[in-house]
Amino acid sequence: MSKISPLAIIEDGAVIGKDVEIGAYCIISSDSTIGDGTKIEQNSCIYGKTTIGKNNHIFSHAVIGSAPQDLKFAGEDVELIIGDNNKIREFTLFNPGTKGGGGKTIIGSHNLFMGYVHIGHDVIIGNHCILANAATLAGHVEMGDYAVIGGMTPIHQFVHIGEYAMVAGASALAQDVPPFCMAEGNRATLRGLNLTGLRRNIEREEIDEIKSAYKELFEAGKPLKDVANEILEHTSSHHVQSLCNFVLKTKRGIPYERKHL
């Protein structure tokens, strides 16, 4: 049974699932869909064409689905899609997509968004990610599964962050971070592998293969894409293939300095 405060504003047309809780002074717009078991605390607002999955917990004063902060936005039909079992903390801001970026911002499941996190238009985030307090993702950023962004860290438009990658707190990232890697600094550069994250879900033998590929990529002194192609010719590791394919597809480049290796 849903529990909706009489002080909340639920516009006609909004779809509210089973066992949903909505606190006082919340606003749920007419185009919104709230999945079963989701809890929305007081003073939070769900705007626009926003679809929220099951068992999410949205804390107070979050603003979800408000118009994208893009000067080209002219009221087009755009949307925000959020998966299941996410925790979205206080004063977070999530924008929908834009016409020029595909029209959708897409958030996966089992993610933690700490206070004051900003998710810009057309962002795509996978599953099991953590964004610490005041992490800021500009438009079109993409994050793979299990990626971590430290607090007070801005991410430039169009940056891609691979699965299991980590960007340290108080950094500023303007280039792509490959899977399994760790970046830190302003501007952030690679600082090795995110071994703590890897050990949670990846077998030791696979980690050793990732380590070997990482050193080969960044110590060879040759163009990264040449080395990536060479590694792909002889590896059977799914994780190493993911690392090398990311390097081959990067558009913003990989921020690394050989001296740190």
Swiss-Prot record:
One of its GO terms (molecular function) is acyl-[acyl-carrier-protein]-UDP-N-acetylglucosamine O-acyltransferase activity. Pathway: Glycolipid biosynthesis; lipid IV(A) biosynthesis; lipid IV(A) from (3R)-3-hydroxytetradecanoyl-[acyl-carrier-protein] and UDP-N-acetyl-alpha-D-glucosamine: step 1/6. It is found in: Cytoplasm. Gene3D superfamilies: Hexapeptide repeat proteins (2.160.10.10), Udp N-acetylglucosamine O-acyltransferase, C-terminal domain (1.20.1180.10). Keywords: Acyltransferase, Cytoplasm, Lipid A biosynthesis, Lipid biosynthesis, Lipid metabolism, Repeat, Transferase. It catalyses: a (3R)-hydroxyacyl-[ACP] + UDP-N-acetyl-alpha-D-glucosamine = a UDP-3-O-[(3R)-3-hydroxyacyl]-N-acetyl-alpha-D-glucosamine + holo-[ACP]. One of its GO terms (cellular component) is membrane. The keyword Lipid biosynthesis applies. Coiled coil: none annotated. GO terms for biological process: lipid A biosynthetic process. InterPro entries: Acetyltransf_C, Acetyltransf_C_sf, Hexapep, Hexapep_transf_CS, Lipid_A_LpxA, Trimer_LpxA-like_sf. Belongs to the transferase hexapeptide repeat family. LpxA subfamily. NCBIfam families: lipid_A_lpxA, PRK05289.1. HAMAP family: LpxA. PANTHER family: ACYL-[ACYL-CARRIER-PROTEIN]--UDP-N-ACETYLGLUCOSAMINE O-ACYLTRANSFERASE (PTHR43480), ACYL-[ACYL-CARRIER-PROTEIN]--UDP-N-ACETYLGLUCOSAMINE O-ACYLTRANSFERASE, MITOCHONDRIAL-RELATED (PTHR43480:SF1). Involved in the biosynthesis of lipid A, a phosphorylated glycolipid that anchors the lipopolysaccharide to the outer membrane of the cell. Homotrimer. This is Acyl-[acyl-carrier-protein]--UDP-N-acetylglucosamine O-acyltransferase. The gene is lpxA.
